[in-house]
């Protein structure tokens, strides 16, 4: 019998999408092929503490009260600082070190035990050796390149895009610049800093109104799952929308609306899978139950209707799938991404690239697994393929020389 690969599933995190991550991770943990993988759940609280074993399970189930009580009591069996161990990595302490040298608090990296291999093929967490990490983390400190940088420093194989792709895929402003450079069609937009909005609100609104017509969509540049997004139909609604978005990021993106007064833009989605030769799924469409596909519509409501495959012409389908792969490559992504589009409901039916999501939702109602299911890749096989892609990408990286030969 072949030896099982040891996979660490990370979830939670310091993000406005913490709860979404818990839902996604629960689905992955339920569906992953246990005949091939030995799975270790790894939780990260909203405060950034790392949890393993029963504490990770409590976090996943939403029962953080038990975790919190044990943390406050200093239970020696609790692992809030679940050590991510690997040879050659120095100890990294949180901004405020624990009061005692051996106190368990915050996140800590430390050299691993001597049996840990030096070739970057394995890491250790809380005494367990792991071959690959699957960060089912959405939003800040999970999908934005920060934790990917940690994995890169430790030489650990992991699912999803690298530091560059993850950070570019999280920042809607940078993402749009890359799309424009690749000559991919995007909607008109304005980028505004929170500092400028707070310093000169009138000037900021004038800048937006000079460039765009109402309605507009106001978004935090670095957040997903439609958190903090508002649709503003006029100046009266624009101010509160900017204030809301500024709670979640220092940079805001304001986009022109697509569609007419009576008909909304069509929202199309494509799932992309692969590394250097990515493949696109069938095209899907979301028909929101609300005015637009916001956080509640995505995760809390049953009003939105997914249509798979989307009702498009052959030419439109081909165009959208090709644009999805082009966007994936433009942002230097790997592993997986969901690519979102807006299509004019009338007139020329122009199609605009909206954004990429480097770690799309994996809940039971999420489009990414549904799109691949419709393309012929079952959920369990999809998870297996993502882990294989992570190992392939890691093996490719080991071919790179990082030091100068004397």
Which residue ranges define each predicted feature?
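Solvent-exposed alpha-helix faces
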Residues: 26-27, 243, 325
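ATP-dependent carboxylate activation and anion-phosphoryl transfer catalytic cores
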Residues: 2-5, 11-15, 34, 183, ...
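ATP-binding N-terminal substructure of ATP-dependent carboxylate-amine bond-forming enzymes
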Residues: 1-164, 168-170, 174, 181, ...
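ATP-grasp fold ATP-binding core
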Residues: 179-180, 208-227, 249-263
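Phosphate-binding site of ATP-dependent enzymes
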Residues: 230-322, 347-352
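Rossmann-like NAD(P)H-binding beta-loop-alpha module
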Residues: 181-220
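Hydrophobic beta-strand scaffold residues
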Residues: 39, 157-158, 186, 216, ...
């Amino acid at each position: 019998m072949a030896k099982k690969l040891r996979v660490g599933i990370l979830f939670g995190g310091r993000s406005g999408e913490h709860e979404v991550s818990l839902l996604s991770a629960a689905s992955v943990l339920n569906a992953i092929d246990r005949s091939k993988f030995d799975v270790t759940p790894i939780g990260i609280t909203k405060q950034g503490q790392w949890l393993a074993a029963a504490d990770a399970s409590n976090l996943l189930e939403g029962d953080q009260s038990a975790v919190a009580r044990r943390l406050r009591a200093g239970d020696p069996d609790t692992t809030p600082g679940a050590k991510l161990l690997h040879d050659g990595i120095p100890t990294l302490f949180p901004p405020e070190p624990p009061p005692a040298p051996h106190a368990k608090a915050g996140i800590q990296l430390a050299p691993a035990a001597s049996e840990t291999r030096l070739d970057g093929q394995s890491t250790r967490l809380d005494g367990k050796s792991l071959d690959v990490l699957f960060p089912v983390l959405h939003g800040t400190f999970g999908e934005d390149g920060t934790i990917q940088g940690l994995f890169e420093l430790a030489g650990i194989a992991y699912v999803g895009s690298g530091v560059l792709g993850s950070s570019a895929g999280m920042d809607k402003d940078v993402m749009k610049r890359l799309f424009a450079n690749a000559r991919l069609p995007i909607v008109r937009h304005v980028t505004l800093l929170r500092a400028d909005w707070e310093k000169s609100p009138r000037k900021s609104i004038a800048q937006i109104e000079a460039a765009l017509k109402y309605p507009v969509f106001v978004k935090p540049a670095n957040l997903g799952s439609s958190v903090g997004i508002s649709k503003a139909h006029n100046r009266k609604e624009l101010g509160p929308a900017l204030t809301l978005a500024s709670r979640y990021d220092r940079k805001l993106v304001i986009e022109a609306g697509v569609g007419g007064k009576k008909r909304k833009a069509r929202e199309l989605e494509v799932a992309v899978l692969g590394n250097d030769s990515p493949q696109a799924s069938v095209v899907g469409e979301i028909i929101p139950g609300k005015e637009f596909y916001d956080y509640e519509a995505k995760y809390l409501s049953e009003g939105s209707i997914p249509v798979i495959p989307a009702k498009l012409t052959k030419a439109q389908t081909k165009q959208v799938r090709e644009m999805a792969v082009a966007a994936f490559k433009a942002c230097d992504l790997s592993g997986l991404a969901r690519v979102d589009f807006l299509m004019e409901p009338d007139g020329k039916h122009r199609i605009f690239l909206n954004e990429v999501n480097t770690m799309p939702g994996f809940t039971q109602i999420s489009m990414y697994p549904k799109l691949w299911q419709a393309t012929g890749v079952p959920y369990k096989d999809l998870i297996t393929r993502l882990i294989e892609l992570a190992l392939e990408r890691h093996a490719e990286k080991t071919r790179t020389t990082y030091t100068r030969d004397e």
